[in-house]
């Protein structure tokens, strides 16, 4: 900043010298040569200073109040455009400064000044054009096509697109002139300046766009817009979009690559970017016309500035009002049923608990049949009497057996060797079928007849239907408790999250990226952090006990807490991990302070967020999300919808006995990434359940994007610049 101010002071000193040299008695040739030398010297000083800033920012004299960093947020860009144009207009108001510019090709010099803002316009445009489902305009078109409440929105959006295109078409030429400022001729620039203010003027387009944001009622007496203090921007296009998003069905909302909050903010950004483009072209054109001797345009310039300032403030207030009432949480739709692939789109715990058929005679050490099936609520398999079903299917000899019950005495069991299953289906003598009956005699299955029997007259040796909890090579039941941390010391933050299974262990994997100012992220730095592998015991050493850096699920401890963790204002998410709390898996999130204007993360002051409530908590205890007779999650033909709230928990359980012979563990775990596009700071992370009645559903991550409404304030200091009226007065 010091070097920039120093350079500008030297430039001003040069200009004062210029006024001395421009005496009437001097030769015009001598004056022109001297002016060229002085201006070139000053320009070299300024260019050197700008180059030292690595083109990340440019600043005008501190007295003008114009400071530009990487202006990726629309409000900052608008303020900067207003300050830059005011400063340049004030300088040009000096007659001899104007004469100097005229002598040196002043139109191109003014064009170069405006070109200094090109990268900042381009940066915001690039962000608005990013996303896997197209840029902001394409996403807004999707709302028109897919939302069930889009009639009003479609009409307004179509009108806005036409107006935006009018401004963009002209700005494309303006941008082309800036890129070729050294060769563009005076006639071309003069035609451009006159075009901006003729016919369907930019001024009218900007006014129409703003009226769509802030509709108002004309005063019947003088047909003037009401006083600025009385304007309340209700019922505008931002509110219309909010209504369309609120009423849209879940399958549409989850298809977006950003939160509803982010989408409305991006519409606001698009409209304010368009306003800034138009205002810059209007001011540029008046400056040129003034140079070309077409008039002073002081009144027009000042009126345009006042209108632009009013529109800027009103748009920001309208956006802030809408954004404060919109959710900034984002979740993803199910992968289409036909595209589901295990360990790519979803993950499941395998054989955590599994339906298991066993005869009572094998459930006690004495091989007796004196009890009923229900007596064996927590037992073990003691043997394999008579080499019957137990000899023809995988046993549960090293595990625990729970919740036995009697169904019928005799059945046909389709035993299978498919991964993750013991049985395909069971058909009882009565004709009752559990599971989906298919051809059984094949390379992967065989039909085994089971008949209960009487031992003497008094005891019935019944086949029981139980649950088997048996660790082993077929049972993936492990969850990493290691922290997944972004490199916050290198100014990285979490930008996305997903579940990954590696070496039979479920991990949290984070996407990280470099934080940039004002909520943005350097897309070139995005990467998924490598998984730190965990080795779990195998063979005889494998148990259902927790180990170093991991938790093992088992019948007694198989619950997952469902929470939304929100960082304090001024913090972003920089890490995630699971912990064990009261036998439950419980999510923790690391939040680190961040400076909004600079994007600088203070990694030394990071904190861990968690929800310590348990089902036994006296106030606000956790409640259970129950799954009633659930089928396999991927069999649902209807997309899942969220059905849990924070402060709940869910237990991993077997699928329905009737639908699936209790062979799978549900809910499944969603493996698809949850990351906004374009990337933005994340201020919250949650785990929730989504599903449909009668199915296991999925546990999945959701994320909260930055609430921009917290930062949409315009202070009086930001309007602290000198106008032309001040200069002339």
List where the protein language model places each region.
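A positional/structural detector of protein chain ends, strongest at the extreme C-terminus
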Residues: 1-5, 726-729
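Lectin-type carbohydrate-recognition ectodomains
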Residues: 24-729
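Cleavable N-terminal signal peptides of Sec/SRP-targeted secreted and luminal proteins
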Residues: 3, 8-27
């Amino acid at each position: 900043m010091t070097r920039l101010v120093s350079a500008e002071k030297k430039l001003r000193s040069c200009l004062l010298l210029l006024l001395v040299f421009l005496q009437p008695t001097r030769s015009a040739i001598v004056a022109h040569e001297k002016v060229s030398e002085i201006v070139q010297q000053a320009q070299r000083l300024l260019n050197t200073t700008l180059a030292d800033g690595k083109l990340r920012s440019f600043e005008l004299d501190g007295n003008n109040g114009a400071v530009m960093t990487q202006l990726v947020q629309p409000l900052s860009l608008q303020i900067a455009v207003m300050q830059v144009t005011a400063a340049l207009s004030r300088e040009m108001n000096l007659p001899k400064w104007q004469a100097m510019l005229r002598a040196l090709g002043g139109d191109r010099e003014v064009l170069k000044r405006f070109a200094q803002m090109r990268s900042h316009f381009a940066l915001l445009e690039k962000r608005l054009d990013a996303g896997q489902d197209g840029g902001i305009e394409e996403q807004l078109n999707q709302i028109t096509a897919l939302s069930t409440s889009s009639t009003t929105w479609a009409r307004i959006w179509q009108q806005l697109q036409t107006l935006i295109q009018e401004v963009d078409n002209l700005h494309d030429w303006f941008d082309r002139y800036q890129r070729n400022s050294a060769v563009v001729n005076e006639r071309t620039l003069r035609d451009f300046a006159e075009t901006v203010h003729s016919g369907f003027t930019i001024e009218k387009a900007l006014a129409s766009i703003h009226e769509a944001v802030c509709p108002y009622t004309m005063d019947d007496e003088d047909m003037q817009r009401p006083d600025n203090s009385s304007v309340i921007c209700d019922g505008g296009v931002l509110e219309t979009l909010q209504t369309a998003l609120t009423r849209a069905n879940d399958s549409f909302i989850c298809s977006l690559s950003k939160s509803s909050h982010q989408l409305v903010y991006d519409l606001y950004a698009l409209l304010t970017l368009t306003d800034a483009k138009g205002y810059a072209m209007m001011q540029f054109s008046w400056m040129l016309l003034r140079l070309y001797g077409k008039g002073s345009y002081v009144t027009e310039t000042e009126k345009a500035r006042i209108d632009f300032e009013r529109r800027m403030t009103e748009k920001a207030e309208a956006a802030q009002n809408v954004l404060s009432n919109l959710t900034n949480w984002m979740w993803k739709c199910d992968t289409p049923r036909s595209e589901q692939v295990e360990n790519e789109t979803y993950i499941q715990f395998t054989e955590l608990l599994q339906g298991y058929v066993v005869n009572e005679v094998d459930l006690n050490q004495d091989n007796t049949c004196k009890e009923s099936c229900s007596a064996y609520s927590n037992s073990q398999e003691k043997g394999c009497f008579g080499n019957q079903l137990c000899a023809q299917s995988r046993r549960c000899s090293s595990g625990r057996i729970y919740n036995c019950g009697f169904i019928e005495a005799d059945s046909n069991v389709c035993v299978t060797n498919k991964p993750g299953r013991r049985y395909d289906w069971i058909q009882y003598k009565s004709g009752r079928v559990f599971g989906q009956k298919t051809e059984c005699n094949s390379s992967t299955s065989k039909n085994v007849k089971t008949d209960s029997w009487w031992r003497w007259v008094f005891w019935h040796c019944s086949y029981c239907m139980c649950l088997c909890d048996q660790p082993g090579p077929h049972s993936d039941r492990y969850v990493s408790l290691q922290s997944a941390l972004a490199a916050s010391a290198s100014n990285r933050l979490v930008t996305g999250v997903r579940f990954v299974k590696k070496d039979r262990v479920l991990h949290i994997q984070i996407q990280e990226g470099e934080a940039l100012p004002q909520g943005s992220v350097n897309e070139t730095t995005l990467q998924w952090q490598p998984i730190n592998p965990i080795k779990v015991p195998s063979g005889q050493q494998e148990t259902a006990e927790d180990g170093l850096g991991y938790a093992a699920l088992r019948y007694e401890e198989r619950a997952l807490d469902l929470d939304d963790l929100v960082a304090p204002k001024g913090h972003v998410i920089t890490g995630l991990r699971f912990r064990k709390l009261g036998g439950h898996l419980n999510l923790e999130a690391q939040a680190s302070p961040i400076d909004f204007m600079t994007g600088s993360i203070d990694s030394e002051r990071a904190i861990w967020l968690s929800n310590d409530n348990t089902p036994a908590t006296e106030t606000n205890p956790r409640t259970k999300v129950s799954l009633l007779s659930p089928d396999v999650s991927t069999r649902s033909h209807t997309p899942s919808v969220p059905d849990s709230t924070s402060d709940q928990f869910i237990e991993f359980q077997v699928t329905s006995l009737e639908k699936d012979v209790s062979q799978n563990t549900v809910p499944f775990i969603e493996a698809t990434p949850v990351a906004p596009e374009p990337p933005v700071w994340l201020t919250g992370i949650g785990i929730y359940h989504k599903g449909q009645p009668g199915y296991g559903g999925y546990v999945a991550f959701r994320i909260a994007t930055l609430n921009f409404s917290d930062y949409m304030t315009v202070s009086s200091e930001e309007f602290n610049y000198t106008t032309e009226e001040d200069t002339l007065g």
